Amino acid sequence: MLDIKLFREEPNKIFDSEKKRFRDTINVEKVIEYDNLWREGLQNLNNLRSEKNKLSKSFKQAKKDGNLEEVISKSKKVASDIKELEPKIEEYERIRDEYRYKVGNIIDENVPVSDTEDDNEVIRTNGDFPSFDFEPLNHVDLINLIDGADTDTASQIAGSRFYYLKQDILFLNLALIQFALNELKDKGYTPLQTPFFIKSEVAEETSELGEFEETLYKVENEDLYLIATAEQTLAALHRNEIIDSEDLPLRYCALSTCFRKEAGSHGKDTLGIFRVHQFEKVEQFIYATPENSTLEHEKLLEVTEGIYQKLGLPYQIVAIVSSALNDNAAIKYDLEAWFPGSGTYRELVSCTNCKDYQARKINTRYGKAGAGDAQILHTLNSTAIATERTICCILENYQQEDGSIKIPDVLIPYMNGKTIIEAK
């Protein structure tokens, strides 16, 4: 969430940002309204408490002057006013922050402003499209040809958008995970495997409000949700902590299974394993100082691109328009890889700078040890590999005329030397 000082000192900056998101500004107006009520109430409360203290100190003199009952009566009235005002102030603060949670991050100046994703800006492309002397198939047909997944049986067991990974595709999945983790470890990241569950309080601090209905699975009769991404558990890793400035940046990579309802994508990509309810992902997460977060965002994207360059997958980097950014994001780049069988680019990676917005919710700060001047730091995150989607992309780019799939060179060591997945 945004710093409350920003609403007081630079409200126009927030109004402008919300307009760039093509939203009504009512939430900003309500924050300012209830913050004014809270501040006014707090001032009145402090005045009443000061008056009560003065009255309490005057009891002895009032007794000498013979007006003790009058002073006691005034003191009781002030105490009653305090008791009446305190819950009102708490309610003003609660309502203020409820609206504050609904206001998105300040849009970065480099974000293209538009209300349609058709205006996403292509920053650069990398790699050559594969050349085929046959009509390339899409990933749905290809995974069936190599008998790499069983979605029909899985739908009977668990419902739609679930799957059994089979045979060489299972090992390809594991190869991608190991490859990505090793690449990131070599770049100085700390590898982790995070919990698959998150408490509701922590989910509220690390997630979008809209995710609870559209994305997150709730565990019945438990104060737990299944994570949609390791970003959530990585963001909470240093919750309510102060990190020494000398230790920044902190770079983590984490393997997790991710669980998503995909309620907002009904009817999209219902076949194959591209858009599913359960998938593996290696996530990157960085804690940085405000001064270095833009540079860290560039490095984060560079490291991510290196993974797909080594996999030999052609891609484009796209700056996402303002209206499509989630609340946490100040700026986001997507890596969209080329799917020749489908004839289109498709998103494999989102790389986001949340600046201080996310860290403020989870109360993660930085400062010199013992200095007492801790400040909110910046957080950044990016997909390294969402393996099921990347498998789909590999299938289309590395397909052979007979339906077999060549294995990217960098993955062969993780596949026990296997170089090709044969069609069945």
Curated annotation (Swiss-Prot):
UniProt-recorded Gene Ontology molecular function terms: ATP binding; serine-tRNA ligase activity
Enzyme type, top EC level: ligase
Cytoplasm keyword on record: yes
Annotated compartments: Cytoplasm
Keyword Protein biosynthesis found: yes
Gene3D superfamilies: Bira Bifunctional Protein, Domain 2, Serine-tRNA synthetase, tRNA binding domain
Disulfide-bond pairs as recorded: none
Enzyme Commission number(s) from the entry: 6.1.1.11
GO cellular component assignments: cytoplasm
GO biological process, one term: seryl-tRNA aminoacylation
Record: residues binding ATP: R260, K261, E262, V276, E347, L348, V349, S350
Residues that coordinate or bind L-serine: T229, A230, E231, E283, T383
Reaction catalysed by this enzyme: tRNA(Ser) + L-serine + ATP = L-seryl-tRNA(Ser) + AMP + diphosphate + H(+); tRNA(Sec) + L-serine + ATP = L-seryl-tRNA(Sec) + AMP + diphosphate + H(+)
Record Pfam families: Seryl_tRNA_N (PF02403), tRNA-synt_2b (PF00587)
Keywords: Aminoacyl-tRNA synthetase, ATP-binding, Cytoplasm, Ligase, Nucleotide-binding, Protein biosynthesis
InterPro entries: aa-tRNA-synt_IIb, aa-tRNA-synth_II, aa-tRNA-synth_II/BPL/LPL, Ser-tRNA-ligase_type_1, Ser-tRNA-synth_1_N, SerRS_1_N_sf, SerRS_core, tRNA-bd_arm
Biochemical pathway: Aminoacyl-tRNA biosynthesis; selenocysteinyl-tRNA(Sec) biosynthesis; L-seryl-tRNA(Sec) from L-serine and tRNA(Sec): step 1/1
Function: Catalyzes the attachment of serine to tRNA(Ser). Is also able to aminoacylate tRNA(Sec) with serine, to form the misacylated tRNA L-seryl-tRNA(Sec), which will be further converted into selenocysteinyl-tRNA(Sec).
Family statement drawn from the similarity comment of this UniProt entry: Belongs to the class-II aminoacyl-tRNA synthetase family. Type-1 seryl-tRNA synthetase subfamily.
Comment text on domains: Consists of two distinct domains, a catalytic core and a N-terminal extension that is involved in tRNA binding.
Subunit structure: Homodimer. The tRNA molecule binds across the dimer.
Protein name (record): Serine--tRNA ligase
Species of origin: Methanosphaera stadtmanae (strain ATCC 43021 / DSM 3091 / JCM 11832 / MCB-3)
Gene: serS
